[in-house]
Amino acid sequence: LWAEALGIDPDNLIAGDSSSLNIMFDLISWSYIWGNNDSPRPWKDEETVKWICPVPGYDRHFSITEHFGFEMVQVPMTPTGPDMDAVEELVKDPQVKGMWTVPVFGNPTGVTFAPEVVEKLAAMETAAEDFRIVWDNAYAIHTLTGALPDNPDVIALAEKHGNLNRFWYM
């Protein structure tokens, strides 16, 4: 049911018993302490960890990266999603380890990412091999009309571009 609503392969879906914010905190905490499956070392051993924060954005996201002492780098939101010229420039820096996103009805602006923005996020080259995008799709099925928004399969898109581990999808 959820795989169909989210437009993803059911094999890529795990039903959890925790809030998505707790899961996000745990994933970042794990990467901070031990690294993730693409990390050359734990993030705590990095001189600096930077995180892309589209603004305006969700304050609870920002509190997680603030908790770990990450340098939060602001990127403006546009009517189609984050400013991709800015994002693509920032990810050339190996200290940039991740990015927050709310791709559908983003909090607080209500912006839904355009297909070309989603494609760029899945395909872009990053200097950090362990770069992650938190894909917080909390509002994927929240609509005021009978029509659900498009929910692109970012996992399949990332795999198509050789970036299978790019997204932490919530």
Show which residues each predicted segment covers.
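Donor nucleotide-activated moiety binding/catalytic core segment of transferases
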Residues: 166-169
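Residue-level marker for buried hydrophobic side chains located in beta-strands
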Residues: 133-134
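Conserved core of the PLP fold type I
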Residues: 1-129, 141-162
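Walker B catalytic acidic pair
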Residues: 137
